[in-house]
Amino acid sequence: MPKTLTEKLNAIKATGKGIFVPYIMAGDHEKGLDGLGETIHFLEDLGVSAIEVGIPFSDPVADGPVIEEAGLRSLAHGTSTQALVETLKTIETEIPLVIMTYFNPLFQYGVENFVKDLADTAVKGLIIPDLPHEHANFVEPFLADTDIALIPLVSLTTGIERQKELIEGAEGFVYAVAINGVTGKSGNYRADLDKHLAQLHQVADIPVLTGFGVSSQADLERFNAVSDGVIVGSKIVKALHQGEPIQDFIRQAVAYQK
């Protein structure tokens, strides 16, 4: 039986709408983790498809400056993995949450304990950008009997045979990385990006979402046209931190009809 995240995103895809997943950094709020539920409900009310929730880490190798700074602010507010898990247990939402974490915080907490402690929360997906596919066995056995999907990341340089290997048996969605580099770098896309995304569609039987560097209306239109939806991080994180209006951008993303 498919996991909840797979079912919910496939249902959105079936309507012809683009899938929209904003990223937020847990604890990057004037109230620290006490403000996480407020942010999740704000995004839920705008109709987003799912929400990616980052766990702060002191050495975020895949993060650009906006998200790296958000992580430092969160850590300064006292955010810990344990505190985040306890906070997630108190948040009621119909929107699937996807945890984005580097492996170190997960290892320190204990993978088995982490998965068990999230069992009764809205968390339905897990992204670990620094965990090689060959080491997925450190995590996958603990997810097998749960409703949490391990999300594969596929870079632009990944050949088709490797794509098949990464995607085989995956649930939730495929995270297609739009740029070679860190998050937040917009506009410098490879000429063969559309071809790469079309190839991913041929081998994936779950939605393909494009992320890293997606920040403008033009990006929304481009990537919704060649993938099943988009993930937006730095633009959302910056707007929430600075109190800038972001509602119209999110509404446009949510309403996108393919």
Curated annotation (Swiss-Prot):
Gene3D superfamilies xrefs: Aldolase class I (3.20.20.70)
Catalytic activity: (1S,2R)-1-C-(indol-3-yl)glycerol 3-phosphate + L-serine = D-glyceraldehyde 3-phosphate + L-tryptophan + H2O
A Pfam cross-reference name: Trp_syntA
GO annotations of cellular component type: cytosol
Known pathway: Amino-acid biosynthesis; L-tryptophan biosynthesis; L-tryptophan from chorismate: step 5/5
Described function: The alpha subunit is responsible for the aldol cleavage of indoleglycerol phosphate to indole and glyceraldehyde 3-phosphate.
Protein name: Tryptophan synthase alpha chain
Lineage: Bacteria, Bacillati, Bacillota, Bacilli, Lactobacillales
